[in-house]
Design a protein with these regions (language model features):
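Active-site phosphate/pyrophosphate-binding segments
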Residues: 217, 228-328, 469
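N-terminal export/assembly segments and adjacent metallocofactor-ligating motifs
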Residues: 1-223, 250-251, 343, 429-431, ...
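Long, contiguous, secondary-structure-rich segments that constitute the structural scaffold
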Residues: 416-466, 517-525, 530-612
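Phosphate/diphosphate-binding loops
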Residues: 5, 11-15, 357, 363-367, ...
């Protein structure tokens, strides 16, 4: 028996008991206060993926057109990569190389150690703006921090609001915390998700109208002594009736929501990431936090967590030019980038405006190195593919951006063939580059010991239980509403006549793009019956969905849980398996806050495919 830790991009960061005596099997660690002995629905695919015959076992070298390969040895593949790195550095400098990485593997060594190598050669740096950064930046401007409350304190709340998050699918342990408390549960979400069905009250604003919803709540609260003086008289015009016309939420429900926020204190708000991927998404998060401040609930939000981990030690200090993640295609078009080194990410699946991204990589003949477990869409575009290790095949630590526990991940089996962990790959690359600095060759155990010592974690206890509690580092909340009024006044709802708003949330089966090749994803277009009737469409019709970014064909699913005026296509499906995914349609426009993603501000036309 050993302890594993889920390194996927998920709030829960579960502690796992793993056995490999009679075949690989996993179960939730019953001692862990959050995991509490059970794992999410997606966890069963971890074993299937690790043992899959589809896994890459030998490095691949491109031959001719992209997608054509021959197998080579790891030694040869790394020689090709190092030769290309040296050629580019000599020709135009390290900044012509861009590591493209994100949260496909969040384990601390796997995530940060490769940065030591890239910082050593002075590459460009990818700005992580795809997920939650807009909301995080907005919270920092208003409160001085994006670090919220300990989720275990949800048990102390009289009311819990899940705003723009579907924890029944994406934070199952947090959902159970809420459901086993005595709190009244509100869900704010345009879609009637499984979370909304399980809540006491579901508020369903049109996408992108969270700001007028909050302003109308403040309008109601102004009658009960809650003074929003920092934003002037804006709230006066946002009566529930006025806001109802914008949001689609009945005025009476807005009033009830406002009074519950007033009377059911203490309350907590779990601020989700999906709804802030709108053009004004960061401002929406900031407006919610402002409302909470006025009600004396400043710190009672869940958004992010920090624990004093020395990230500079883990990854070094980046000094290269910043390249935005969301509109990578346009960044590649205007910057001299000659190599993309991809790990912990599948950008030719997960980034918006896929048609342009693929076109520019092809047109500029950008050299691509991809380190992954499978021959996914990004790997199919690569010049060199290096097989990666699963998290059962290396030692690491996993922290959480939700709770206050760090977990050990112990190696339980060897990688297949020449598959290699992130740590070991970059040690070999450093050696082949001729580097001598100790930090480039530091071992996994040495790094683990240093991190644990810094956190005052007893190593023996960690290895005995699989996890340890660590201190949340939050700092003092410093309220600063400067400029908020002007920001709110700049808001106007987005509409496009004749178009539906496209939402691309996470589905029940996947984490990002992981698992579509193992289980298969939902690739239907989900539409409200009313919109289908207006467009003369029926369930099961083959439809064309199009906008200025692309055109795709799929089948329609009539779904009353979808908000009128919107269409849902779940993200993460593999274009190499289905011929397309939702990011062939999504906008790569960015927000004001941290150039954050705005994919949920995409609009599309939907038409029935006509028989020829």
């Amino acid at each position: 028996m050993a302890f594993s830790a889920c390194p996927k991009d998920c709030f829960d960061s579960c502690s796992i008991i793993t056995e490999n005596d009679k075949g690989l099997s996993i179960r939730g660690n019953p001692m862990h206060p959050i995991t509490s002995g059970f794992l999410c629905y997606k966890a069963k695919f971890f074993v299937d993926a690790a043992l899959s015959e589809k896994r890459l076992k030998k490095p691949l070298l491109r031959e001719g057109k992209r997608g054509n390969f021959r197998e080579v040895t790891l030694e040869y593949a790394l020689d090709v990569v190092v030769e290309k790195i040296k050629e580019i550095i000599n020709d135009c400098g390290g900044e012509c190389i861009l590591p493209v990485e994100y949260a496909g593997n969040r384990a601390l060594i796997s995530y940060y150690f490769p940065r030591r190598f890239f910082n050593r050669i002075g590459t460009s740096v990818l700005q992580h703006s795809l997920c939650d950064e807009a909301g995080s930046a907005a919270l920092r401007t208003l409160l001085g921090t994006s670090v919220g409350m300990d989720p275990e304190d949800l048990r102390k709340m009289r009311m819990i609001v899940f705003w723009g998050i579907n924890p029944a699918w994406t934070n199952v342990h947090g959902w159970r915390l809420a459901k086993t408390s005595n709190a009244k549960i509100y869900v704010v979400d345009p879609t009637r998700t499984d979370t909304a069905r399980g809540a006491d009250v579901h508020i369903d604003p049109r996408p992108g109208t969270d700001i007028p919803l909050v302003l109308s709540i403040l309008n109601v609260l102004s009658n009960y002594g809650i003074d929003s003086k920092e934003i002037g008289d804006i709230v006066l015009r946002y009566t529930p009736e006025y806001a109802s016309r914008i949001t689609g939420v009945d005025a009476s429900r807005i009033r009830d929501f406002a009074l519950d926020l007033l009377n059911e204190r203490p309350f907590a708000v779990h601020i989700g990431y999906g709804f802030q991927r709108n053009i004004k998404g960061g401002l929406a998060v900031k407006t919610i936090a402002y409302m909470m401040h006025l009600l004396g609930m400043d710190g009672n939000f869940i958004y992010d967590a920090k624990h004093g981990i020395d990230y500079v030690y883990l990854g070094g200090t980046a000094r290269g030019r910043i390249i935005n993640q969301v509109n990578l295609a346009r960044e590649l078009e205007r910057n001299d980038i000659r190599m993309l080194f991809v790990y912990n990410m599948n950008p030719l699946n997960s980034l918006p405006n896929q048609n342009l991204l693929r076109e520019i990589i092809e047109r500029k003949n950008i050299f691509m190195v991809v380190h992954d477990l499978f021959l996914n869409d990004t790997a199919l575009f690569a010049d060199v593919v290096i097989p990666a290790a699963s998290f059962f095949e290396f030692n690491d630590l996993v922290d959480s951006y939700y709770h206050d526990y760090i977990a050990i991940n112990q190696k339980v089996m060897d990688p297949p063939g020449e598959a290699i962990s992130n740590h070991d790959l970059f040690v070999l690359l450093s050696r082949k580059m001729g580097f001598r600095e100790h930090y480039l060759f530091e071992g996994e155990d040495e790094i683990i010991d240093k991190v644990l010592n810094d956190l005052n974690v007893n190593r023996d206890e960690l290895y005995r239980k699989g996890f340890a509690r660590i201190r949340r580092v939050r700092g003092e909340l410093i309220f600063n509403p400067e400029g908020l009024r002007e920001e709110i006044e700049s808001y106007s709802p987005m509409e496009r006549e004749g178009y539906l708003r496209l939402l691309s949330p996470t589905g029940i089966h996947g984490v990002g793009s992981q698992h579509d090749n193992i289980h298969g994803f939902d690739i239907f277009a989900h539409m409200n019956p009313s919109d289908a009737l207006n467009l003369n469409l029926n369930d099961g019709d083959r439809v064309v969905i199009k906008n200025e970014y692309g055109t795709v064909e799929t089948f329609l699913k009539i779904d009353p849980s979808v908000k009128i005026g919107t269409i849902i296509i779940y993200r993460g499906s593999w274009p190499s398996l289905h011929g397309w995914n939702v990011n062939y349609l999504t906008t790569d426009d960015v927000q004001e806050y941290s150039m954050g993603a705005a994919m949920n501000s995409t609009f599309v036309k939907v038409e029935k495919v006509r028989d020829v």
